[in-house]
Structures are given as C-alpha cells and as structure tokens.
Amino acid sequence: MDNARPAIYHLSVIFEKLLNNVMVRLTCGRPKSFDKEIALEKALDVFWTQGYDGASLKDLTQAMGINKPSMYATFGNKEQLYFQAVEMYKNREGAPFFSALEQPQIRDVIETIFSRTAEAKCSNEKNKGCLMIQSSLACSDESSVVKISALKMRAEFIQLIQNRFERAANDGQLVQNADIQVMTHYAVTMLDGLQIHSIDSPPPEMLESVAKIAAEHLFQFCLPLSSQ
C-alpha cells in the first residue's frame, strides 16, 4: 500500500500540470473584451481613409485594438466588416440628409442639404470625402461586390433626391415644366463636388459659399412662397 502512494501521487501531479497547461492555452486564446461599436467605428475610419482595397487586415485589427480571431468571431471576414461599417456610415452621415428631405418646403430642403454638407465637411478634423464615392471608384475587380454595393447606395441616394423634387412639383412648389432630371443630377453633382473638394481642406467659408451658390442655382426652379 505504501509503494502505491508515490505512484498515485505522481499521477495526480502530472494530471494537475496537464490541466494547468490546458487552462493557460484556453486563457491565451480567449479574445479580450472590447467595445464592438468603438471597434467598428475604428474600422470605418480605416476604410474611409484608405479605401476597401487599401485597408489590410493588419491595418484594421491594429486600429480596432483586437486580433484577427476576435475580428472574425465578432464581425466576420473583411467584406462583412466593411458592410457593417457602411451601415454605421449610412446611419451617422445620412441622418442629417434624411431629416432635411422631410421639410415641407423644397427651398428649405435645398438650402439645408447643401449647408449641412458643407458644415459636416468643415467640422471634420480630417476630411475624407465620401465613402461611397471612393468605394465605387477605387475598387479592384476582386472587390466587385463592394463596388456594386457602393453604386447601388449611390443610386438610392440619387433616387431619394429625385423623389423629393417630384413631390415638390406635385405640391406646386416648382416652376412649370421644371426639368426634374436636370435638377436632380445638378444637385448630386454639386454635393459630390463639395465632398470631394473637402479632401483638399479648403477654408470652411469657401465651402459654405460654394454650397450657397449651388443652392441658389436650384432656387430658380422653385416658386416663391407667395406664388404657391
């Protein structure tokens, strides 16, 4: 019986060491806790600054403060992470635009979407332009899904503006025979231009003046309130 005790003791020691090694490995492999929204915001900033193709997994995980296994477990692959970042971009950057479209008077709509675009670009410490424009222009053939998605979102954006002008026409707020297609594409061209030009960091008052002139050009298609 005395000879059996050392053998049992040694087995228990070996088992304990094995158990400790397993626990250490599990602990090391366990992802650190992190704020998902903040991590996604950091990923959005990388995609916005470097583009989809230019953003490497190393760039993304370093900015997010997580490792690759944690990224895959939480957000999926790079493409899935990008689309979640785009949804965040749409909700945050698009909110002022969507609320502007709901104003009853088309003159107020026009003035607001241009002034808010200029203000948003002037308020950013690092102007990055428009994520959707950059994604649609700077994607390789391998990233065609991303490019198609960006083009689809831009088409939806254009359609929203056209729908609002059509509503204004039906409400008698536009001059007779106003060319809604031309108005729509003029508005989109000028809004795109403001966002692209903001990358050059022009003086804020310059962007605001350009936005004001663009809005005034569209006012020529709008009836004054007294005539409605």
Language-model segment annotations:
Residues 2-26, 114-119, 155-159, 163-167, ...:
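C-terminal peripheral helix-coil segments that are non-catalytic and often amphipathic
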